[in-house]
């Protein structure tokens, strides 16, 4: 393990987050439904959804809610960073492709979580755990649960997120100017 500042701790994703949690909601509520093709690649957290009744959106699908972070578990979507920070869903709930892994922890900065699972080390390590036939390979869920992350206090998570966003804004500005 690498050294972290004194007020940080090393934790495993599975001990910090609920992985693939379920939602309890009335079946007749409107909910989001997000198939894979409605999720953008490339660390943008851009997605769109269809509105369905909760009974249909949840049945046989991955469930998620406002505040969750979701990322693809199947190749090549995982490497392409098809991922999203879920917010402003109808009635704060949704269902979608079974090819997603969901992380939930309301006490961790959502953007910090998003950047952790977008990190090149996380992606490279996940690819090493692939199983299945070519074109249908998936990362091992145990890899996700056991992945070690440095966890700073919430104020430091926010500072890190702000710095990442500053750097991305510079990159986007530079690429737009070119």
Residue positions per predicted region:
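Catalytic cores of nucleotide-enabled group-transfer and carboxylate-activating enzymes in metabolic
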Residues: 147-152
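A short beta-sheet element
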Residues: 60-62, 66-118, 130-135, 141
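Non-catalytic DNA-recognition/assembly elements of restriction-modification systems
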Residues: 1-24, 154-161, 169-175
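Proline-centered turn/helix-capping motifs that create local helix->coil transitions or kinks
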Residues: 21-28, 79, 121
